[in-house]
Amino acid sequence: MSKKPPNRPGITFEIGARLEALDYLQKWYPSRIEKIDYEEGKMLVHFERWSHRYDEWIYWDSNRLRPLERPSLRKEGLKDEEDLFDFKAGEEVLARWTDCRYYPAKIEAINKEGTFTVQFYDGVIRCLKRMHIKAMPEDAKGQVKSQHPLSWCCPIDPAGSCNQSMGSEDWIALVKAAAAAAAKNKTGSKPRTSANSNKEKERDGGKWFKVPSKKAETSTCIVTAEIEKKEELPTSSEPFGLHIDSVPKIVFPQPESTLTNKRKNNQGNSFQAKRARLNKITGLLASKAVGVDGAEKKEDCSATAPVLEQAISPKPQSQKKNEAVISSSANTQKPALLSSTLSSGKARSKKCKHESGESSGCIKAPKSPLAPELIQAKDLTLVSQLSSVINKTSSPQPVNPPRPCKHSERRRRSQRLATLPMPDDSLEKLSSSSSATDGKVFSISSQNQQESSVPEVPAIAYVPLQKLGPCLPLDLSCGSEVTGSQAPDSSYPGGECPREEKEETPLFANPTSKVVSDVKGAAAATGILKTEKKVKLEEKTSTAFGKRKEKDKERKEKRDKDHYKPKQKKKKKKKKKSKQHDYSDYEDSSLDFLERCSSPLTRSSGSSLAPRSTFTEKTTTYQYPRAILSVDLSGENLSDVEFLDDSSTESLLLSGDEYNQDFDSTNFEESQDEDDALNEIVRCICELDEENGFMIQCEECLCWQHSVCMGLLEDSIPEQYICYICRDPPGQRWNAKYRYDKEWLNNGRMYGLSFVKENYSHLNAKKIVSTHHLLADVYGITEVLHGLQLKIGILKNKHHPDLRLWAYSGKRKDQDQVVAGAERKVILQDTANSEGRKYVQNHKEPPLKMEETYITSEHSYQKPQSFSQDCHSLTDPGSSDDDDVSSFEEDGELHVADNSHLLYSVKERGVSEKNPASENKVFVYNDKKGMEGPGDAHLQWQLNLLTHIENVQNEVTSRMDLIEKEVDVLESWLDFTGELEPPDPLARLPQLKRHIKQLLLDMGKVQQIATLCSV
């Protein structure tokens, strides 16, 4: 087959090029070329978003390959007529927003790449492709008189007054005309049902009053309600922001009336069902209606009232004229009922809008006196009907309740925690401080606007005043005295407000921006560690929003009474643990971990590991538990929603005298310790994260288990308890379970059966430790002998590349290093670790310690090891295998070298320096290189190596003598116990094997018995 790829349009035969490939199931998938075989003429094709095991070799001329982007004739045939238009700069069009709906816009500029810069009716400028722009109907063009950037609300003239009637009516006319033109274009379509009755109108700008949260991707709480409303509106409803003077003079344009007649004929009998659905969402429309009016800041300070009744209950044309009069008469007939409902709905809709990131304003129509002839008797009945509908629908569970976003919830909690708690009587005074104003409609100012809406939506998130600033009404005639009982009257049929919502009001006495700016950074500004930790804890847990102080007190009493003693006992045990064991050979991270556990203060300061403590989910609990900060919730479930919600600043702190009986420490330490107690984790084999009965705590991960589930009683807890996960961590090697059995190596203690009174390992701990030291010394000798074999191999081979590392003998250092014995351990461990792997990488030998270090440590083998140092390694109870091996390496045959130069280490320059020999290096043998011949140099190198081998052999002999003495000590202990002198070990070897095999069988049976009994 040819080595040149074929010419296939749309396919680039390069590695990484994208195309479409047909898999064996005859489905086309986007794919990528991984490899190309020019010999065979095929390619390795990777199907995107599939595993690489599905990669397939396909011939490059196969019909299973096709271009990724191919022209679609079907799509081209379905192009609309409006695609033929060529738009110009400054032309009015319908542009598509991110919610896939079209809104009135104006073309600002036409870019080179075929995109259009458009400015939407609300001032937002975006760059759109041609496909997202539609021509505006001719009868809708040129009707906009005001092009203020905030045209969705009332346009503001230079004098600052609100040209509301002009801007609103113009946009209404534009939208109505666009809807009518769209309806004319669809003459041949089938009759519309109630579900899609207004769909084209929505696309062609039906959302002219859209809440500007579209810039934050259209918050769901408002958009959902508006979509429902728009799909079910028989006509375009009257605007929310109409000037009140224009209400009696409403003239409906001719296109709307003809459209209404068409719709009535098409819809048929679907009106009644639609009417019932409209009644359900009336409450939401009432609250949403005020969400779109906004930016009225410099309004006259007379008493104001939003006229929203036209939009509350959308009705057919016959009822619309009546409601135009209702809207004007509502102020005098039912002021308290309607206005309280609407104002509380306004606060709620403002919160919904601001949760999606909005900071733009809201408009409010000024109240003007109404002519008395507009008030009619049948209008009054409609007003009462409307108010009853609002009463029903504005219950605490609306159809589409606005969901609070998490960010605002956190801000609200930080406000509560940062503010000093106020007494209950001040709360009541705050909520019911002023008398009810029945004769006039009030407007809610600043923070009190939020307070009145709290009973409506208990789960709403509070928004700081800085964000609410642009949309706060400036009618301060009522001051801060706002009736707190009117909103509950309209929302709760019984006329009473649940008290848990009343206590949830934010405790701000002064609603100024200065206070809010302090509150916004409350967690950082206070500088109190406990407040920050509580906020973090509350953020992690999904909490309900009710707050009952009686329950809080009962919870505290129950916590103090029932679950304090087991925690006390375990805390004492934790302190004792860190004193009685030697953890010198643990890892560094483990040392930090143990320091955390040793005292209350250091435990809390080490809580930077707390992000790992998210073990409330069952599926993610089984992780390696090294860095878990677990604490005791004192009888409370971590997932208990109300406990965390009740945790205000004072309720989470236990008083200092409760801990004086346990710790002799300061109050600060007690509070820190109790603060850790909030993070404790229950991780038991039963997978229940609640505390019942007696609890035991793992000494490694500090997680708590039920003693009943673990098969342990209160009087049978072992000295060292390690949980089942730490002993057998999932995802680790099987030998990781012995990580916590270092008691056996350090102290010679092993777990025994609980019913055996005398544990053999406890009685013979010293002998076991001595045996361990003996084995460690034997292991170290084995490593040294292996290193000697390697060196002898280098000595025999004259051309070995590593022979030049012995270019300089270390004999001259005898005079310099008489003092060096003491500091040797400090300096050389890092050196051996940092440069010790070079030889292993070159020669691929087994990674034993001596072969790593026989080339890479210093020429200090000339000074023989003193007997006292060897005895010290024997008698030190805390030393382990690593100590013995490293002590021999350091004293036996240490020298530092590089593959290219012989380097003196830092010890040659000064013994007490602690950094490795990477900075102060002295080049020695380069000076001699020119004077000596190559044959003499090799001979000298071999001589130096031979001397080194002899010294190491002397050290091995010395160490063997010490091992023999260790064996003598163990045998003397055997004689001291009265046992007979053991016979020749070789003769006992078969018997020993049988005994070990029998012991393994017995241990297997014991393990099976223990497994069955624990269940």
Curated annotation (Swiss-Prot):
Stretches with biased composition (Acidic residues)? 879-889
Tudor domain residues are: 11-71, 85-141
Q: What is this protein called?
A: PHD finger protein 20-like protein 1
Region: Disordered; residue ranges are: 183-206, 309-367, 389-455, 478-513, 539-585, 859-889
Where are the disulfide bridges? none
Check the record and name the PANTHER family matching this protein: PHD FINGER PROTEIN 20-LIKE PROTEIN 1, PHD FINGER PROTEIN 20-RELATED
Record's subcellular location:
Nucleus
**Gene field:** Phf20l1
Tell me the keywords, alphabetical order. Acetylation, Isopeptide bond, Metal-binding, Nucleus, Phosphoprotein, Repeat, Ubl conjugation, Zinc, Zinc-finger
User: Gene3D superfamilies, alphabetically?
Assistant: 2.30.30.140, Zinc/RING finger domain, C3HC4 (zinc finger)
Glycyl lysine isopeptide (Lys-Gly) (interchain with G-Cter in SUMO2) cross-link site: K75, K79, K530, K849
